Amino acid sequence: MAAAVAAAAAVRSRILQVSSKVNSTWYPASSFSSSSVPTVKLFIDGKFVESKSDKWIDIHNPATNEVVGRVPQSTKAEMEAAVAACKRAFPAWADTSILSRQQVLLRYQQLIKENLKEIARLITLEQGKTLADAEGDVFRGLQVVEHACSVTSLMLGETMPSITKDMDLYSYRLPLGVCAGIAPFNFPAMIPLWMFPMAMVCGNTFLMKPSERVPGATMLLAKLLQDSGAPDGTLNIIHGQHEAVNFICDHPDIKAISFVGSNQAGEYIFERGSRNGKRVQANMGAKNHGVVMPDANKENTLNQLVGAAFGAAGQRCMALSTAVLVGEAKKWLPELVERAKNLRVNAGDQPGADLGPLITPQAKERVCNLIDSGAKEGASILLDGRKIKVKGYENGNFVGPTIISNVKPSMTCYKEEIFGPVLVVLETETLDEAIKIVNDNPYGNGTAIFTTNGAIARKYAHMVDVGQVGVNVPIPVPLPMFSFTGSRSSFRGDTNFYGKQGIQFYTQLKTITSQWKEEDATLSSPAVVMPTMGR
């Protein structure tokens, strides 16, 4: 009992520390007592406002399952007000010079740097990942903001002078209007930062719906954007679940939707949003394979497999959840298990923690059930993390590193995205067999090959039907000057996130054919035939 009281007190202390730092905007420290918990605000037209909803969702610290806050399911009126604020702000923001919009983002990236550790602490409190991993979450999002500051180069149009005498042809990119983003729980800072900074620097206004499980980081990011000089109404934030998603998919004033999350939700949003005439980009699930050749650097490969499989407790869409050991590389399996055993499982804010808890008890149960299915279907559990107990955090959603071998492509633990600290291991005799396994899997988010042979690496990179390939790089998430190019069942849409494709998604082309005659003359008679542009 005493331990439980102490743990609860520690959680309250962390809430109050974070609250005071962010001026009690959405976690008002003064309202926290033994009978109440902080409430997350809405952000509408430049103001953080308390929701009038009668439906609220508890936010839990995954390490303790202690309630640390409550987030509203926004009412229809509140969601309408948020879109209306976006719509009102759009004309002036779109007409704001591109240099002025760039200056807002330049100030914004500096404020994110200055507040990076505070954002990371909020992430760890609500999501559970280690503080170091949470800082990486913020940093990878910050890189996209920094890239968005290059908008003056990214939004260049095209020209073709003198297509005929006195006639020029040119195009430029224009914002769409009101855009919306629906973010997942696993990257509370990075994914929102993939969305609204890119959209807004192009001249759009933005409606953001963070995950109801981890809203705090997005709210702090909104405050920092406001402090950077973004006009009221250019970014608005609502909260909720299914009703909020349907609202975004159906609202006629929303022109484009960015989504990251599960396949079930992504397919639904893509179909419903597209049916309503919206652009939709949806990053979804994955089953990322790491193919290990026997000539690979053994030390580096084993360390990279362990880090990429179990970091963030496997709750990454780019987690390396499947290892394919080719030929003699299968002899490395015992050493792989020993390295995974050495990882330290603890609450994310504890020193030395390598991985924290899963997001919810339901997520833990699902992961454990998938491990069970492997054993029942004939696989071997070489390392079992199902019964791990973390001292002082016995109520947390912890699963330790788990390695399942003798896995076949027909097994449930292989076919489903586990989204937990579980590595499934398959074995093949040849590279061609490994390539077939990867290509037969429906997902196409990421893959990696570990080898010291350049010809093998090139063959693999060219033959696998996967959008992002790493060569001795286990998690090949592109830097933002490129784009996140997941494919097949991992993505729906025509245009990917950030980079050049991100600019294309959030803009539309306008093409202008202009004629200014050299002589000051007028037509002597109407031209009634089809223009041939001088040909």
UniProtKB/Swiss-Prot annotation:
PTM annotation (N6-acetyllysine): residues: K47, K52, K55, K76, K87, K117, K129, K298, K330, K331, K364, K376, K500
Family statement: Belongs to the aldehyde dehydrogenase family.
Main location: mitochondrion
Disulfide linkage: none
Subunit structure: Homotetramer.
Job of this protein: Malonate and methylmalonate semialdehyde dehydrogenase involved in the catabolism of valine, thymine, and compounds catabolized by way of beta-alanine, including uracil and cytidine.
The protein, known as: Methylmalonate-semialdehyde/malonate-semialdehyde dehydrogenase [acylating], mitochondrial
Organism placement in taxonomy: Eukaryota, Metazoa, Chordata, Craniata, Vertebrata
Source organism of this protein record: Rattus norvegicus
Amino-acid biosynthesis keyword on record: no
